[in-house]
Amino acid sequence: MAAATVGVLLRLLLLPVVVVVSLLVGASRAANVTYDHRAVVIDGVRRVLVSGSIHYPRSTPDMWPGLIQKSKDGGLDVIETYVFWDIHEAVRGQYDFEGRKDLVRFVKAVADAGLYVHLRIGPYVCAEWNYGGFPVWLHFVPGIKFRTDNEAFKAEMQRFTEKVVDTMKGAGLYASQGGPIILSQIENEYGNIDSAYGAAGKAYMRWAAGMAVSLDTGVPWVMCQQSDAPDPLINTCNGFYCDQFTPNSKSKPKMWTENWSGWFLSFGGAVPYRPAEDLAFAVARFYQRGGTFQNYYMYHGGTNFGRSTGGPFIATSYDYDAPIDEYGMVRQPKWGHLRDVHKAIKLCEPALIAAEPSYSSLGQNTEATVYQTADNSICAAFLANVDAQSDKTVKFNGNTYKLPAWSVSILPDCKNVVLNTAQINSQVTTSEMRSLGSSIQDTDDSLITPELATAGWSYAIEPVGITKENALTKPGLMEQINTTADASDFLWYSTSIVVKGDEPYLNGSQSNLLVNSLGHVLQIYINGKLAGSAKGSASSSLISLQTPVTLVPGKNKIDLLSTTVGLSNYGAFFDLVGAGVTGPVKLSGPNGALNLSSTDWTYQIGLRGEDLHLYNPSEASPEWVSDNAYPTNQPLIWYKTKFTAPAGDDPVAIDFTGMGKGEAWVNGQSIGRYWPTNLAPQSGCVNSCNYRGAYSSNKCLKKCGQPSQTLYHVPRSFLQPGSNDLVLFEQFGGDPSMISFTTRQTSSICAHVSEMHPAQIDSWISPQQTSQTQGPALRLECPREGQVISNIKFASFGTPSGTCGNYNHGECSSSQALAVVQEACVGMTNCSVPVSSNNFGDPCSGVTKSLVVEAACS
């Protein structure tokens, strides 16, 4: 390689460092961000960028720096976030950018870490967020029609978009000002549904593009899932795979704004997850096929605090099986394996930005892509096996390569494989749930649970029916969202009838009451007592509840409590999707029926306890009763207790097992809706999900037949030294003595590396040079600062089987394995053990061997 070529290569390799340094310098110089057909271009240099979504209101300001640093350590260049209109302008014209809503602080935190920002303004965001991120007051603007060529909507959308842009400009946060924002997005996945709006939809889309460009941010704008996005906007791809995506112009780069790292959880659904091997395969295929910007949706999902969930029926946890979990801990092996993929991609960056891809077939379902400069000085290659069943052996550049099914091998020098997406070098972490001496294995959470059974509880009864002076009486049944404006989840429908005893809808004192509702949850009370309840689901929120009721001579009171569980957030005209009791409401018996749908109904928005702010411990209320014999398993009741925060700095959650459905507040801050009685279906889950073959949201599910969510995150910043307050509103009935606080702890770290694995990616210092001559190695590292490897629970070199926490020796096993690993690892914060017969002896010649280790840290 000529000296000049080496110099160019070194400059390209050092470019990310230069960018990081420039961002960390206080008032950084302005950057010129453009694009060409290959990549985003920053100050004249094409960049291969890896991005990840972190939504600022789904975590806390105290968590942001750690989340961002873990993202950087995982190999990200960019943090992507939506902007959530509803939290910033809950009341029209009154803006809020404080606390978890402090967008400027979040963007500055990203800049402080030396990363870029992609700001997705929308302002429609979907995001499984309540009403798609729109404030509900927008629905009541006269003459408005959402997301179409409607002047009222466009005026409001432009006003808020300008507010966001002006706020960013005012803080100097665009790259054109020396800030970290290099990209912005207008609208969101509109192309998925724009056909429903006809010509007006196309006109609106073009208007939105023009409006965005006119704001003069100095950085490119994108539209995702919009194949006809007009120039200069870049149309981008969202999905599980985007390697086959092509931009709508030869002048635009191939960009992937949402690579779904898992899937969201719904109340009543099983827990979805996406294997690390498949996610890595999708990423590598995208860069192989010409992509240069890829974003994980989500990289950290976080928590839907308060009433922010959309859906309806989106769960409070927005973990998303992301590389950083809901609590801010790295999820292994996903985080580590993707980190290795990113390092491999970055080793290829000089070739990816300097050359056009050249594709060739290596046989059935196998493909080589080469990026090579005209003078052959720089070359990188990707070898893919897209067969979902069979491993392949291929010839490339005179060498033989083995390609596992559904995998990509990355060769930064067109010769040496530094990574194969199906071969994980990263460690696995497991945990266990310990509760008062019992121990249950769990692959996600380790939770030490001090019970609240002996805590002193106060309670307050929430009255049934109408108690407020501002109640409204009208004939007929009113749609819920138009009535409440989403001020509360709850709307009471109340009426009464007089019974003589000979009515045709009676059978003695019995009758059947039928209530039809758009959802989402319905409870029927007759004369103050619960007579029946029903719920919809994520697939259909509709309710048709028929329940036997007992009526008494004289006046009978009928109270219906309709409850929303997040407003619709996706689809054409999603803003018009209603909720609440629509009728008929009908009493029926053997000789006739009485339709109550058109009678006078009295409506009350929200609960008495909400008006009294019972969730706020700083506001005293005479409603609270302190009694050791507090009621349990009773609907419509508030509970309150005091607790001391769990010691240490481990992430905290509350286990709501034993409760029904409700909402919880810690020191006055809502940690979200809880619903541990909503169970996943009994079927559809798999013990081990095969990563090979196309992934879908229902392919890999776990926890069938179990509650969708029992653990609810309490950020440490919500807690205070000494005494803390926990308040619950319980809608269905439960026993608060069964509630427990939990802290998340890792119990084991494991790794499984074979002789066929590439060497650790960290051993490569350039596309052509490795710092070591050794082959594959097994690496372990304790997850927390200050920990050391204290115990080797299992070690086997040969043909071991099983999974972390449940390994077994195979027929072939080295007798030296445990001693060798103990010598290398015990007492160390991290260790690396060569996977070679030279290290362990050869227990079975001619057989491909693996090293498996399970260790504990303390």
From Swiss-Prot:
GO terms for molecular function: beta-galactosidase activity; carbohydrate binding. The active site is at residues 189, 258. CDD domains: Gal_Rha_Lectin_BGal. Glycans are attached at residues 32, 259, 482, 507, 595, 830. It is an enzyme of class 3 (hydrolase). It catalyses: Hydrolysis of terminal non-reducing beta-D-galactose residues in beta-D-galactosides. Its EC number is 3.2.1.23. Gene3D superfamilies: 2.60.120.740, Galactose-binding domain-like (2.60.120.260), Glycosidases (3.20.20.80). This is Beta-galactosidase 6. It comes from Oryza sativa subsp. japonica.
